[in-house]
């Protein structure tokens, strides 16, 4: 099996890692370090020319192209929401697949081989719709998603808690850009068992950004009398500045927000936004958001039947956990200091890589990961009541069945409506789908015995079977969630993704050819205007200059136009320099000179004084000298 990578597909930032030399190593993004370190922004954009941009390049142009830029797509995973960009609609899975496609490409460049398999993490509180959408995104990106694991489980692996000698109970506080997960795990004898999980899929660092953005907008309005909230470009700049200030205030006590020319007044001209932010002001603004985390901590403890004092370790992951107020809050709620030593922005990806390494056989480990289902699974019964089959926080993989009957006389079919959630009425929970068991023999109500059985695999994906115990007739399905894509849809989206990949390849080829042409033009002009100025004829000079001009005119054109012009220029230069070389060479056999058989260089004709060879490569000085020891020709 080839390399299996671990991926943290985040709301605000994403990261990937792979096992190298027995250790998880973060895969660097092609664009290098970002504000988030080795992670990169989960931002997707389309330029005005339709070019796909992912990561830091997408984030950088968001100010000037906000309408075609998508942030926090993960918050829409599992829903039927669509993003409208340039008269085209994109599903959340497709936007996420662009991020995963970039990760795949970066990983292949890093490990030097094709990467086809991945372990992807999801928030522990993700329902089946969201998990299935994540798998679909991986498939569209050309990845075989061999395992979906919960982010807290991955983080615990990254912190090395599997190597602890004593049994322990770990609270993982996962506060990301868009979701909060609080998970309590028990570790002992190499077994990680999730005892409980709680959280909020709509609470995260982006909520902090929002209150900070609102504060900046309000302060500017008070000072300048201008409301920037409806100015898309201004708001994009402010959002970027707010996120930057939030990150900076994690390590310094104050920072300045400076946004010149943020607005224009016809009477007074351009207006600049200048504001000093302090950590205390940030704490004041985000305090209510941090307080909203407390119920999730309490619920996780309650479900695990534990008290604060039972917790041995606290693991913090996610960008917002770098904020001192967040660390202090969790520490005070539990009454224990938090663990350190692993970057909270990288922990999940590193843990996913460890799990990937176990699957690939790169890591020898006795670790067993036992996750739980985050929400209760059940079906809708008479009157719209939800009947639970698998309770929340049940260890998975698992299987459980229950026998039901018909609600009417002579009923020949039943509809099984599967729901996920904690509300007593089916309509108040998340609908995962429905299916029919048909051709039942007519019978009085209450007589047929229909067993409904739920199977949940290690990825949290649900399969349901309904069987008539009288006739043994059964229907088996994998839950087709409302957002699950058909094979045809996935194939089409894969083709779209490959199209963008092909466009990227063509773009690179175009840039490489342009760079080659510009370099050749520079060298040629140097030859004509300096090195060979007194050695070439006027006719030769005009011929070369005209050819250079023709290349310059098509520098920004497609390779089909540029390449023939460049080759024509190279041919003219080679022809002129070869003629000069022949004219300058003394007759064969002259004392100490290289004979005719020494004129051929390694890759083409060797030119005088730095001339180009046939393959376009430049020699250092181009002079040929005879070696006194072995008669070989070499370039000085």
Curated annotation (Swiss-Prot):
Residues 590-623 have a biased composition (Low complexity). Disulfide bonds: none annotated. Keywords: ATP-binding, Chaperone, Nucleotide-binding. Residues 579-636 are annotated as: Disordered. Acts as a chaperone. It comes from the Archaea. GO terms for molecular function: ATP binding; ATP hydrolysis activity; ATP-dependent protein folding chaperone; heat shock protein binding; protein folding chaperone; unfolded protein binding. The gene is dnaK. Belongs to the heat shock protein 70 family. The lineage of its organism: Archaea, Nitrososphaerota, Nitrososphaeria, Nitrosopumilales, Nitrosopumilaceae. It comes from Nitrosopumilus maritimus (strain SCM1). One of its GO terms (biological process) is protein refolding. This is Chaperone protein DnaK. InterPro entries: ATPase_NBD (IPR043129), Chaperone_DnaK (IPR012725), Heat_shock_70_CS (IPR018181), HSP70_C_sf (IPR029048), HSP70_peptide-bd_sf (IPR029047), Hsp_70_fam (IPR013126).
